[in-house]
Amino acid sequence: MSYHYDGIPDIEIDLYWNKARNHLLKAQVECEESLKLLSTIRSEMDSCQKSRLKLQFILNCLVNQVEFFSSVILEKCIAVELLDNEWSKVVLVGVVKDLNYWQDEITNKINALKNTKYDLNAEYKSLADFICEDHVEILQQKLDEVPFIKKQVSNIRQHYKSIKEGVQYQLKAGKVKKLKKYYETHFSRDNHLFELLEGEYLTKLNSYESELTDYIRSITDHFDKCSILKADGLPPQDLKDLFEVVKNDDAELEHIRELIYESDAEITQFYKNVEGTITSIKENVADFYGLSTKIMVELEKCEEYVSIFQDIAKLVSVYKESCIRKIEQVQELCEVYDKFKKAYFNLLKERERRKSVAIQMKSILDECKGKLMALNEDDLDHRQQFLHENGDYLPENIWPGKIDDMTPLYSLEYTIYNEQK
């Protein structure tokens, strides 16, 4: 038998070292399994906490979506902007008022033309004979459509009221309120399941991890001391003191192993308890998703409701734009009719002016005719006097056809146009 130089048998040191090594290897395996289980538990507990935050996010999104649809889409965009302003005030009041005004205007303009007698000839009776009187129907057609538009707006207003009540009472006060209450009941920090996760379970989890770590550390420290003792690298007295420590610690190995065994059993049961709690939470999560899905289905229906309003809005918009174009057309016609009437009276003045000019021309021409006739008679007298004094002495061929010609030196033909009609 060999001994250390301090007198401690090598076989006894080897015995302690081998025993420490065996216990360390077994403890590492046992603790590793338990630590993996604890890691799984922690991961699932963290997952539950994340699920709660995710559900809170979903809840907030749904609440905001419903509130947005109710307050912005329904109340602001549809009720205020479409129903109250665009449809009721702009179209059914403003546009209809303009339609009636310009309908009266074009009717008055056409009547004014009818009442304006045409004096230029007998073919036409009044200025209205020169225009298309069907123009008076341009706006009347749009006015005839007003009752239909009013009915559509009235129907859509009732539809809006029904949707608003549905969103208010069935969705907001019903499904959303129920989802809020369900979340507060099952996912608030006061919920007993999450109190277990954040309180008792988390404390136990940390405690078990700490215990197992301490157990492994204790056995590892003992093994390290055995290895130092086996290496025989310390002074004799230090080795002797270390041997006593190893000897005393060796007596605790079995107890530590028993504690590890007990911890493993407790951790297994702890895992089952946590799994039961997590299963309950997952069931609650599934129920939450079921309730939230119902809300999302209702929101999809809300999108369909909006499409109905969009269709009516398009119909009213087309009607409004059509009315505006027709009103502009009638405005142009009214302006043309005014100018036509004014131009006609100017035409009458022009006729009178031309008549006056024709009279002046006739007077000038009559005066000219009288002077020409007098001058012609004087000319004839002079010709006859010439022939009497000289005709017998001049041969005919000296100015052929001219000497005894008594044709007047002028020819006056004219026409004065003085139209009365």
Swiss-Prot record:
UniProt feature coiled coil, ranges: none
Domain of life: Eukaryota
Keyword annotations: Autophagy, Cytoplasm, Membrane, Protein transport, Transport
Family matches, as InterPro entries: Atg17 (IPR007240), ATG17-like_dom (IPR045326)
Gene Ontology MF terms: molecular adaptor activity; protein kinase activator activity
Principal location: cytoplasm
GO CC annotation: Atg1/ULK1 kinase complex; phagophore assembly site membrane
Membrane topology: Peripheral membrane protein
Gene disruption: observed consequences: Mislocalizes ATG8 in the cytosol, when ATG11 is also deleted.
Pfam families: ATG17_like
Keyword Protein transport attached: yes
GO biological process, one term: piecemeal microautophagy of the nucleus
Subcellular location: Cytoplasm; Preautophagosomal structure membrane
Keyword Protein transport: yes
PANTHER family, per database record: AUTOPHAGY-RELATED PROTEIN 17
Complexes and interactors: Forms a complex with ATG13, ATG29 and CIS1/ATG31. The ATG17-ATG29-ATG31 complex interacts with the ATG1-ATG13 complex. Forms a complex with SNX4 and ATG20. Interacts with ATG11.
Function: Autophagy-specific protein that functions with ATG13, ATG29, and CIS1/ATG31 in response to autophagy-inducing signals as a scaffold to recruit other ATG proteins to organize pre-autophagosomal structure (PAS) formation. Modulates the timing and magnitude of the autophagy response, such as the size of the sequestering vesicles, through interacting with and regulating ATG1 kinase activity. Plays particularly a role in pexophagy and nucleophagy. With ATG13, is required for ATG1 activation by autophosphorylation. Recruits ATG9 to the pre-autophagosomal structure.
Miscellaneous information on this protein: Kluyveromyces marxianus proteins are shorter in length and have a more ordered secondary structure than their S.cerevisiae counterparts, which might contribute to the superior thermotolerance and solubility. K.marxianus could be therefore useful as a new model organism for further elucidation of the molecular details of autophagy.
Family membership noted in the UniProt record: Belongs to the ATG17 family.
Name of the featured protein: Autophagy-related protein 17
Organism: Kluyveromyces marxianus (strain DMKU3-1042 / BCC 29191 / NBRC 104275)
